[in-house]
């Protein structure tokens, strides 16, 4: 068995398979479409998350800020910042290519922030999805 095949087998061990969550509008952004793909690895206690949002209104229309930030919230209510989404204003598209979070069951939230480095959301999230 080659190194690549062995690495792929090792990387796949403990994986639970990708979970796809379809987003079809929210109270604050009715035209929003997209998906969140979460690939949990329960053996390692982590999840790889990808976010792809279409028809996403500019951040200024959804809150007081210029940056979309993705967050996790664990069962105890502790916040974790995943990072800022890449926003393409002309295409009205928001993406986060890939992040690994140290949880396998959590709420994923997206808020609008003036400072993408804050420790917790400062505005009401416009998108909330439970990942499990």
Residue ranges and their predicted role:
Residues 1-15:
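Sec-dependent bacterial lipoprotein signal peptides
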